């Protein structure tokens, strides 16, 4: 069960957490060149994706409550992280601190570092992610964790 009163920081995954994909086809090549070209050219690489209004309510609540929020997505290069950060700002209207990492496994590592750097207890940080393994790693290390669906249900039940 989420304890938002205790949360001082929310860390958001990107793909299928903040940015819901509807195109599930594989990249055309092993380097995902089409996506990279769009990112480099400043085109909307997520044109088929949608935001979620319940998640937006929680993000705006966190802003109003003075809670920190960060983006913790697994990326392969800086331009991907910046592109995701900009997409969130454009669609949710919230600027997230960028804590993107090189792998899913490193999400726990950056969460531990964030807790130490900012003086937070582990249970004062909430990870919202669609991958069960990430949620499990976070919870096993004392962090709060929730899937996007849990957040949506929480907002619909307790917010408006």
Question: For each predicted feature, which ranges?
Answer:
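Active-site neighborhood of HAD-like aspartate-dependent phosphohydrolases
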Residues: 1-50, 154
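Short, acidic loop-to-helix structural element flanking the phosphoryl-transfer center
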Residues: 29-71, 78-82, 108-109
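Short, structured coil segments at secondary-structure junctions
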Residues: 94-95, 140-143
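Short glycine/proline-centered loop/turn elements that form peptide/ligand docking sites
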Residues: 26-29, 111, 131-137, 147-158
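Conserved Lys-Pro-Asp/Glu-containing loop-to-beta segment of HAD-superfamily phosphomonoesterases
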Residues: 107-133
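A short, structured active-site edge motif that brings together acidic residues
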Residues: 74-77, 85, 91-110
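Short catalytic/ligand-binding loop motif for oxyanion handling, primarily in non-cytosolic enzymes
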Residues: 18-22, 78-82, 107, 133-137, ...
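Structural beta-sheet core signal
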Residues: 71-73, 127
């Amino acid at each position: 069960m989420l304890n938002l009163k205790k949360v001082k920081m929310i860390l958001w995954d990107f793909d299928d957490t903040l940015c819901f994909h509807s195109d599930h086809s594989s990249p055309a090549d092993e380097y995902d060149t089409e996506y990279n070209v769009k990112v480099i050219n400043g085109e909307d690489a997520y044109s088929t994706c949608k935001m979620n209004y319940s998640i937006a309510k929680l993000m705006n609540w966190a802003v109003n409550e003075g809670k920190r929020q960060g983006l913790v997505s697994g990326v392969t290069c800086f331009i991907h992280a910046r592109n995701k950060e900009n997409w969130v700002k454009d669609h949710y209207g919230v600027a997230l601190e960028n804590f993107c990492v090189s792998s899913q496994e490193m999400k726990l590592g950056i969460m531990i570092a964030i807790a130490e750097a900012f003086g937070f207890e582990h249970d004062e940080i909430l990870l919202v992610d669609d991958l069960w393994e990430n949620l499990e790693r976070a919870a096993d290390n004392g962090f709060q964790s929730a899937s996007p669906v849990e957040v949506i249900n929480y907002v619909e039940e307790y917010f408006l």
